[in-house]
Amino acid sequence: MPLIDVNGTQINYLDEGPRDAPAIIFSNSMFFDVTMFEKQAAAFADKYRVVRYDHRGQGGSAKEPRNKLDMDTLTDDTAALIEALDLKKCCFVGNSMGGFIGLRLAARRPDLIASAVIMGSSADAEVSVEAMDAVTEAIEQNGVAPVVEDV
């Protein structure tokens, strides 16, 4: 998978479908990677340009210290990715953490997105990285594959 330099980090991404088609960008949940939306990408890639990416610190993207894993930075990464790939007015689809990013993009950068699908998320303040330590440990031991099948 290709890496792209955006916002001071390297982001791993997949870019599928016709390049001149309307674009959909999928933003996964915390602890997941591009495979989370694999089935959805397969369903849309014949008629849409479909971009899936790993957030900084996740999957194949550059590992980062905790102080660079806040939602504002992740939102800036996503905006920079949309601009770098020239997705124009894309449809943004975000689940959980991806939903937090989508809400911020819609409010702060409406020039980048035409529509947003926000799932399993809210406009509440996000949980701190430290509060997720137990979940992080469980996923490191068992992986995310069993959970992805249910999403």
Report residues per predicted region.
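Hydrophobic alpha-helical packing elements
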Residues: 40, 70, 74-77, 131, ...
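Active-site loop/turn elements of alpha/beta-hydrolase fold enzymes
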Residues: 55, 97, 121
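Conserved acidic catalytic loop of the alpha/beta-hydrolase fold
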Residues: 72-90
